[in-house]
From Swiss-Prot:
The keyword Phosphoprotein applies. InterPro entries: Get2/sif1. Keywords: Membrane, Phosphoprotein, Transmembrane, Transmembrane helix. The gene is sif1. It is a multi-pass membrane protein. Residues 26-37, 54-63 have a biased composition (Polar residues). This is Sad1-interacting factor 1. GO terms for cellular component: endoplasmic reticulum; GET complex; membrane. The modification Phosphothreonine is found at T134. Its main location: membrane. It comes from the Eukaryota. The chain crosses the membrane at residues 160-180, 231-251. It is found in: Membrane. It holds the Pfam family GET2.
Length: 257
């Protein structure tokens, strides 16, 4: 009985020592005491346990990670400030976000330091604005997707039928084939221009290209794109003129010969 009571007493003492050791380590961590004092306490506790273990039954040894006190005190010299370099790169980057500015609008000094990015950013804004305006204006004028293939198919076969008729008529009536072919082609393209006048292409690509070019060339392209509708109208008028001349040549063949 004495042996059992002695073993129980030793176990209680070991538990109390462990509890004291855990409380001391937590206090040292909070107060930031030196690691030398904590290491001496750990050694003293280990020596006391070694003395008690001589008279007690063998106990499984505890791991060294539990016995050795970790130094959890904060040391500013050992901290690696890796994010500082990333923060510096973020500060010098033109894509950084300004949380204190409304709607995260880039500051003006970013455009002064990066002129290439300024041109690219302005081109993106202009192209997005033109694309939204074009979609808004032509929203009610776009052809449905179901009827678009049918429209292209009709134009294709109408063009083929007209050219076939011209070739047959010129062959049997001994008419010059080349002028009449050009006349019919001009007529067909004129009708296509008249029907598709409201579905013109977008000029956002030319605007983006003009923003990336040097000032003289960019201004020239922007100035030229403003006259694209007039060029389209001139081409349409030229096609209609050729068609009228073809009709005159048909009724008055003496104009050709």
């Amino acid at each position: 009985m004495s042996t059992a009571s002695e073993q129980a007493r030793l176990r209680r003492e070991r538990r109390l020592n462990k509890i004291k050791q855990g409380g001391a380590s937590r206090i040292n961590q909070i107060l930031g005491q030196n690691s030398d004092d904590s290491q001496s306490d750990v050694r003293a506790t280990a020596s006391e346990e070694a003395v008690h273990s001589e008279t007690a039954t063998p106990v499984t040894p505890m791991s060294s990670g539990f016995m050795e006190k970790r130094d959890d005190t904060f040391n500013a010299d050992q901290v690696e400030y890796l994010p500082s370099q990333d923060y510096h790169n973020l500060e010098s980057s033109p894509f950084k976000l300004q949380c204190d500015s409304p709607y995260n609008v880039p500051p003006e000094n970013m455009f002064n330091q990066n002129p290439d990015f300024a041109n690219f950013f302005q081109a993106m804004l202009q192209s997005a604005k033109e694309g939204s305006d074009t979609n808004f204006q032509g929203e009610n004028e776009q052809i449905p997707q179901a009827t678009a293939p049918l429209k292209n198919l009709v134009e294709k076969y109408a063009h083929l039928l007209a050219i076939s008729i011209v070739v047959i008529v010129c062959y049997f009536k001994h008419l010059p084939l080349l002028p009449w072919t050009f006349t019919v082609e001009a007529c067909l393209f004129s009708i296509q221009f008249v029907l598709d006048r409201n579905n013109g292409p977008s000029y956002s690509l030319l605007a983006s290209l003009a923003s990336q070019l040097p000032p003289p060339y960019g201004a020239m392209i922007r100035h030229t794109t403003s006259y694209v509708p007039y060029f389209t109208q001139l081409i349409t008028d030229a096609c209609m003129t050729i068609f009228a001349l073809g009709l005159c040549c048909y009724f008055y063949p003496s104009l050709v010969y």
